[in-house]
């Protein structure tokens, strides 16, 4: 069995690849944002804000598309790559590498109520731009969902031609992820708790039981379970990661088993990665925690990562 590689992207210092006991840096000195799978065991990455790059199985990187727009996220449906921007647009990458804007996304009902998230810190208003934070599709490829921050989770069933809103805008969604096998199950991390859909993202229920705080920022599926991170707010000095069965209706419980009850800052959007029995969590403090036995035990793999932006296991 091939040992999986854990990729941890950072906003300022490239990307770090961990395979077994070895580790090395790639794209040094570059800003690497959202990572996503291309569906064939390779990684896609937003590099320096304007390039969509592909990592081959041997670790070599190539640029497959560029844009004048500030890029924020990507997702794949079949062989089609969709890219989100920091001005809340959706682009589709053509076979030639051109990025074509999906005009239908500009007509989402309620778009005029979207807003950029912000907070008052030391007398200054700070926060990310209004943008597309995550993109996902149901396992059968029928439904495309994007997480607008802040604008809910628009949903398309016709390849992005038309869109309908889901989840209240004020819920402040931070990440949306579709189940890798069951096309009905979708989860989202929001400032009001964990949101779960059992009809392909058409409707949602809110789960809060067991959380120490409601501000959820990252979600992932792992086998039959859901992982979700929570903190008091975006700038909290400590956070926690919880786990619960997809089919269960009980409390979310702290992961434990070597993953600290309180981690160093939040686990932000895209910073929980899972693949087979391997899981990885990167916190804002730059710690990377890894489990290779489906969460039976965890250990801290490294420290000092500079502003982690994304985790992907390939």
Predicted regions and their residues:
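Extracellular glycan-interacting surfaces
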Residues: 1-314
């Amino acid at each position: 069995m091939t040992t999986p590689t854990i990729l941890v992207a950072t906003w300022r210092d490239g990307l770090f690849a961990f395979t077994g006991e070895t580790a090395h840096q790639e794209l040094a000195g570059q800003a690497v944002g959202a990572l996503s799978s291309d569906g064939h065991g390779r990684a896609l990455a937003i590099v320096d804000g304007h390039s969509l790059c592909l990592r081959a199985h041997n670790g070599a990187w190539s640029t497959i598309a560029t844009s004048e727009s500030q890029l924020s996220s990507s997702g794949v449906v079949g062989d089609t790559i969709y890219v989100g921007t920091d001005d809340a647009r959706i682009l589709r990458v053509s076979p030639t590498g051109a990025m074509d804007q999906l005009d239908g996304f500009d007509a989402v009902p309620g778009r005029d109520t979207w807003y950029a998230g912000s907070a008052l810190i030391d007398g200054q208003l700070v926060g990310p731009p209004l943008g597309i934070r995550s993109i996902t599709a149901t396992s059968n490829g029928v439904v495309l969902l994007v997480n607008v921050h802040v604008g809910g989770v628009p949903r398309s069933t016709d390849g992005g031609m038309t869109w309908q809103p889901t989840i209240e805008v004020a819920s402040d969604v931070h990440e949306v992820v579709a189940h890798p096998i069951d096309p009905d199950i979708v989860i989202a991390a929001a400032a009001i708790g964990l949101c779960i859909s059992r009809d392909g993202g058409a409707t949602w229920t809110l789960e809060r039981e067991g959380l120490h705080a409601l501000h959820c920022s990252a979600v992932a599926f792992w086998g039959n379970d859901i992982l979700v991170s929570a903190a008091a707010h975006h700038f909290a000095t400590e956070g926690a990661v919880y786990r619960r069965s997809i089919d269960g209706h009980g409390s979310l419980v702290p992961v434990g088993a070597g993953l600290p009850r309180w981690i160093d800052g939040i686990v932000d959007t895209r910073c929980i990665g899972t693949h087979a029995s391997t899981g990885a969590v990167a916190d804002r403090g730059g710690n990377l925690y890894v489990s290779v036995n489906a969460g039976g035990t965890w250990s801290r793999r490294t420290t000092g990562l500079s502003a982690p932006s994304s985790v992907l296991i390939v």
